[in-house]
A protein has these predicted regions:
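Extracytoplasmic copper-binding redox domains, predominantly the cupredoxin/blue-copper superfamily
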Residues: 8-11, 15-106
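Sec-dependent signal peptide recognition
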Residues: 1-6
């Protein structure tokens, strides 16, 4: 599953123009102990990637705006590229009581 996501991201990155004006940035979000995301709100630019890393002892998930639910085991990560400006909400569907946040893409 992670390989497929990575392959899709790499394929999409290769489909654009060969000219690049700025490098793509990656922002990391920790799935910290106490069932929370750190930071909860992220501001990025279109084309940037967010990587969620599970630093907790429990399995968590990342679901952005009701799309595919990505299972993230202890010590693993999942990365999602955000190409379209807007506000996106993400949640751990296993522990949604306080494990939610926002990605703002400018």
């Amino acid at each position: 599953m992670r390989f497929l996501l990575l392959a899709l991201i790499l394929f999409a990155a290769g489909c654009g123009s060969s000219e690049s004006t700025e490098p793509v940035a990656t922002t990391e979000v920790q799935m910290a102990k106490s069932y929370r995301f750190d930071p909860k709100t992220i501001e990025i630019e279109a084309g940037d990637t967010v990587t969620w890393t599970n630093a907790d002892n429990f399995t968590h998930t990342v679901q952005v705006d009701g799309q595919e639910d990505h299972k993230v085991e202890r010590g693993e990560s999942v990365s999602i590229a955000f190409d379209t400006p807007g506000t996106y909400h993400y949640v751990c569907t296993l522990h949604s009581h306080d494990m939610h946040g926002t990605v703002i893409v400018g």
